[in-house]
Regions:
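Structured catalytic/nucleic-acid-binding cores of DNA maintenance enzymes
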Residues: 1-161
Length: 161
């Protein structure tokens, strides 16, 4: 899901002008997110995967972030509340920082530069947990798997509204 491209020095800025801020960057803030979502019908999961909106959130982390936020991945961006936006900002940073500390997620073949597997997959709340019980206390929902933008999407059918 990546690519390698060689740029002339002057072409580099054109490329980065079309890439959104990283979620750990201060530019990924409440005002930025709010302004991006105004009148947008696209679902929130698609936005989190859109590198023009925010760079660096992949499919696994988008599902996990939305679970922590208690947001249904099919919810349209224009219907996202200010509280939802605060949660998206907060939990994007939280999930990604946890994943970094755990060395990433090794599902099949991911290894770090020293050849070690990541360990964040042991922390998954929804990703690859289809038909299992939700891990939130007092939630009796089941984890569902559906597809958004041809990507597997995992969510709790009860606590993600």
């Amino acid at each position: 899901f990546g690519f390698f491209k060689i740029f002339e020095k002057n072409g580099l800025s054109d490329f980065f002008n079309n890439v959104g801020p990283e979620p750990l960057n201060n530019k990924f803030n409440i005002n930025y997110i709010s302004n991006y979502f105004i009148n947008k019908k696209k679902n929130i999961k698609s936005f989190l995967l859109d590198q023009k909106f925010v760079s660096g959130i992949g499919n696994i982390y988008a599902s996990e972030i939305l679970f922590y936020c208690k947001i249904n991945p099919f919810k349209q961006a224009k219907n996202i509340t200010r509280i939802d936006i605060k949660r998206i900002k907060y939990f994007s940073k939280l999930v990604l920082n946890k994943a970094i500390k755990k060395g990433g997620s090794s599902i099949r073949d991911f290894k770090d530069v020293s050849g070690q597997n990541g360990n964040y997959q042991n922390e998954f709340k929804v990703y690859q947990r289809e038909n299992l019980n939700c891990l939130k206390k007092d939630c009796f929902g089941k984890i569902k798997k559906k597809f958004i933008s041809k990507r597997s999407t995992f969510f709790c059918n009860r606590c993600q509204k």
